Amino acid sequence: MITPPVAGDTFAGAPPPPSQEEDAPPYGSVVLGGTFDRLHDGHRRLLKASADLARDRIVVGVCTGPMLAKKEYAELIEPVEKRMKAVEDYIKSVKPELVVQVEPIEDPYGPSIIDDKLDAIIVSKETLNGGFAVNRKREEKGLPLLKVEVVDLLSGGAEGEKLSSSALRKLEAEKANQQEGAASKGV
């Protein structure tokens, strides 16, 4: 089901809002969220694009608790502290002047529906409806709507599948099973 856009939504390719400087990033503060397990090129692309769009601050919600329950191979997801540090370290490596706020989130919204200083939410095509849902919640709370910026994710293989932490966890589980099988056969 496609959720209709809310007033204020924009998409990649649309002109950014005017800024004080021609080359300045279009938004003061941006927000995004994700699991960020085993930080890979897809994550780095999303985080770099987000940092490039922010002038002053980037807020990143990192999923934990109930947000992980339905993930494939959830038991192999790295601890939230490790994932949060990897996100913060990467953003600081690509844009050290940004204020980086990384926090655990236990629901799909996190700080995106309470922080009135945010200007834009960064999403992938797969999470676009989540961006619209955030704006509906912000509207209900009387907060300014966020611009919605869409970043394309990288492919993870020849079949054009997106690069994913789930696929990396699956490979880790298969490798562990093969090693256990070899050990039990005395190989």
UniProtKB/Swiss-Prot annotation:
The keyword Nucleotidyltransferase applies. CDD domains: PPAT_CoAS (cd02164). This is Phosphopantetheine adenylyltransferase 1. Residues 1-30 are annotated as: Disordered. Reversibly transfers an adenylyl group from ATP to 4'-phosphopantetheine, yielding dephospho-CoA (dPCoA) and pyrophosphate. Does not accept 4'-phosphopantothenoylcysteine as a substrate. It holds the Pfam family CTP_transf_like. Pathway: Cofactor biosynthesis; coenzyme A biosynthesis; CoA from (R)-pantothenate: step 4/5. It catalyses: (R)-4'-phosphopantetheine + ATP + H(+) = 3'-dephospho-CoA + diphosphate. Belongs to the eukaryotic CoaD family. Keywords: ATP-binding, Coenzyme A biosynthesis, Nucleotide-binding, Nucleotidyltransferase, Transferase. It is an enzyme of class 2 (transferase). GO terms for molecular function: ATP binding; dephospho-CoA kinase activity; pantetheine-phosphate adenylyltransferase activity. Its EC number is 2.7.7.3. InterPro entries: Cyt_trans-like (IPR004821), Rossmann-like_a/b/a_fold (IPR014729). It comes from Oryza sativa subsp. japonica (Rice). Inhibited by CoA. One of its GO terms (biological process) is coenzyme A biosynthetic process.
